[in-house]
Amino acid sequence: MTMELDTILCGDSLNMLKALPESSVHCCVTSPPYYGLRDYGMNAQIGQEATPEEYISRLTAVFREVRRVLRPDGTLWVNIADSYCGTGSKGDTRDPKYPQGRNGQSISLCQAVRGCKQKDMIGIPWMLAFALRADGWYLRTDVIWAKGNPMPESTKDRCTRSHEHIFMFTKSRRYFYDWLAIAEPIAPTTALRKKAGRGVGKYSAPVPGQPQTQNINKPREKGSITDDMISPVRAKRDVWFINTVPYKGGHFAAYPPLLAETCILAGCPKGGIVLDPFMGSGTTGLAAKRHGRHYIGIELNTEFCSLARERIGGDTH
């Protein structure tokens, strides 16, 4: 089966995924609709289920198809945030005058959540992570997306939410992961410490009767460490400080391109194919295009399909 690349398929994600060939994409980067956040008025939409369990069940079914489509060495990156139990009354989540963004929540969920009390955090991200792990995925890491410019909240009895989760899953024990593509530069003080031979080897002081050695590449006497022996980078940490980016389009929940780019650089080889079953405004496709990867997007909302195509096609980054 010939698969069209660099395209956005309009329709239900589960049905569209079933039409894609097995083991055909290298990586999936996505942010599914959050639970109870916004009603887009679509019959098959995800996020407005009666219970969190139903929401998680539907997402698990979608990602089961993603696993089928993913190559054996592929990775899945899922951006997801939590929801709170409310007072039991529902607000109107469809008024465009109140786009509360990725942190907002206009629908009360208290009456639908078993075991949750009013004002409880539901635990949606970990419910999803454990469900996907139980369904066969390897749960490899939980990245914290820390926002320097979070959406303000009116609450006075807890901290304002300023982070979301990015879970990395894999289909197999061994998989493609380019750690150097997203590596971080080491601090100048770290380089000086390593060059001085302090705190970088097996021992912090000489073994009695032996010269002090350090294990940069292999044991060497103290003072013999040169600049070319010291790696200028380190593996990326699991807290990513990335600000949200304003977007003038009609999609209220667009995540920043840098977030998608980081996942793609690590999880998809150059020339590979990135899948997003919840394409929204097209951020994943935009990031893939900018870095020499192909993309396949799926989006239920026809308006967002048009928006994403226009956004990706007009990008000159």
Which residues make up each language-model segment?
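Core catalytic lobe of class I
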Residues: 1-317
